[in-house]
Amino acid sequence: TSYTIYVPQLELNGTTITMNPKAVGEPVKLPITKRDGAEYVDVENATPLIGVTYTKDGDHVQLTAAPETMQVLQNKPVQGPLSWAFDPWPNQDAPYAKKLNVSGDNIISPSWFKLHSLGLESSPNINVDYVKAYKANGYHVWPLITNRFDPDFTSGILADEAVWKKYAQNLIQYAYIYGFDGYNFDFENVDYSDRDKLTRFVAYLADELHKYNIQSSVDVTGYSNSPNWSLVYDRKSFANSVDYVVLMAYDETWAKSTTAGPVASYPWVRDHAEKMLQEV
């Protein structure tokens, strides 16, 4: 079941966040948790953005109207070396119980968001229990956001800077309500003529998220002569905006290739990684 509310627009003054009830916010799915077959709203992270706060007294919980201000979260930045897992089919019932990396931090990126012409579209599978399970296992949770890999759609939203603010507000609200530490931008197949707009869009989102102590990353392909799939990325500028630039070290040989070959051979991955390190 999906329950959606409209969170007031967030405004920042120093380290204090003010909820402006006069400014209509963006729709946000409430964090639902299941216990013994029943559904409940998980308010642990959601307050005061959903309008309530709570106090515990033994076995009793008291709900009260939430204050209209709160402090910026103090999320800890990730520490390298990083191990990063991408989860295209997030399953709340079977989170990976082990750490991928014991000498640095671990990030999990569930595929939960898509850009929509009117704002952010969340997956019906978004789940607060998934977030809590991974965070309990020492992971940072950075959901993945796609542009649908549609160049025409992407051109439209890149030309409409008014919708950028909606995306930023929604991402911040979701991060505070669900407990996300950051986000991963997976914007692919973008028309080369929109290269500068894409660069500004990523920089805008990263800057707005940073104000609320939320980290960000952007995925880029390896190097090729493809305008929409490789040349469109201004990797150096991305590195000045986001916290991490993620190299998608594939496909050396595409699925539709007329000749057989490896997907990601070691020399190919090494060459692309070394070239990108010279830029970022």
Indicate where each model-derived feature is located.
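Conserved, mostly hydrophobic/aromatic
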Residues: 108, 185, 245
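Glycan-recognition patch characteristic of GH18 chitinases/ENGases
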Residues: 68-170
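Receiver (REC) domain switch/active-site residues of two-component response regulators
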Residues: 106, 181, 243
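Mature extracellular/periplasmic domains of secretome proteins
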Residues: 97-102, 172, 232-241
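Primary recognition of N-terminal secretory signal peptides and signal-anchoring hydrophobic helices
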Residues: 1-104, 178
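A cross-domain feature marking catalytic cores of carbohydrate-active enzymes
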Residues: 87, 112, 143-147, 187-189, ...
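Substrate-binding surface in catalytic domains of secreted glycosidases
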Residues: 118-121, 125, 195-280
